[in-house]
Amino acid sequence: MNEEEQFVNIDLNDDNICSVCKLGTDKETLSFCHICFELNIEGVPKSDLLHTKSLRGHKDCFEKYHLIANQGCPRSKLSKSTYEEVKTILSKKINWIVQYAQNKDLDSDSECSKNPQHHLFNFRHKPEEKLLPQFDSQVPKYSAKWIDGSAGGISNCTQRILEQRENTDFGLSMLQDSGATLCRNSVLWPHSHNQAQKKEETISSPEANVQTQHPHYSREELNSMTLGEVEQLNAKLLQQIQEVFEELTHQVQEKDSLASQLHVRHVAIEQLLKNCSKLPCLQVGRTGMKSHLPINN
């Protein structure tokens, strides 16, 4: 019974373990940090010391500990923390998206003055220019209206096509109306605009204009034609109508695609400007994104 009631005494004081390298050794070889002791004598407060008097360890371990602690890292590496790099990349991305979405390229060069086009087609990204609104500026509201006066232009052009559909002079010239938004000479038709401009430069005399127009046939001329000539003329006219409507369909689809992209960009601008108030580290200004939170190195 006496042997079962005996307990083993365990010494919880690890006096034989170095507080730096955590290796067990003889108690005689362990001592307090002599470097911290000397610094304390020189007037350094105890709160600034690395080791207290209660810590025991090897003399070499304390010296190596202080040597490593005194090796300061370069300031440039400390300043470039992961948070700062991510914040910089995010700021540049937001800045680029807002600048691209606003389409505010106000640089008026000679090309823009000679060939005035819609601002959607002459936008050029310049990273040095930061076209950002003020932080307290009003969020721009998107309007579903495509262009001022566009509805009237589309209806006029459509009405003109329907009125002259039975005319033998039906062709691309019907759509070359400067007042109609969907006509070829409009800025919304950039691909065919250059071709029409080249044709206008080559055609300068009224005689040439008469030659380029489709021939008109009177009822007597049509009656005098043979059945084969009439069928050939009819097939040619139908082919011209098909080509015009295919081109018109392509341009309308392109316009719808641009309108959809413009809508997405306006929504993105609204969301970005609203979310800026939720990011305390970013402030939108004329000079771009600025950080107001100090980075703990």
UniProtKB/Swiss-Prot annotation:
Residues 203-215 have a biased composition (Polar residues). Keywords: Coiled coil, Differentiation, Neurogenesis. Residues 227-256 form a coiled coil. Residues 194-216 are annotated as: Disordered. The keyword DNA damage does not apply. Expressed in the brain. Expressed in cortical cells of the germinal ventricular zone and the cortical plate. Underexpressed in the dorsolateral prefrontal cortex, primary visual cortex and cerebellar cortex compared with Down Syndrome patients (at protein level). InterPro entries: EURL_prot (IPR009704). One of its GO terms (biological process) is positive regulation of dendritic spine development. The keyword Coiled coil applies. Interacts with CCDC85B. Plays a role in cortical progenitor cell proliferation and differentiation. Promotes dendritic spine development of post-migratory cortical projection neurons by modulating the beta-catenin signaling pathway. Belongs to the EURL family. This is Protein EURL homolog. It comes from Homo sapiens (Human).
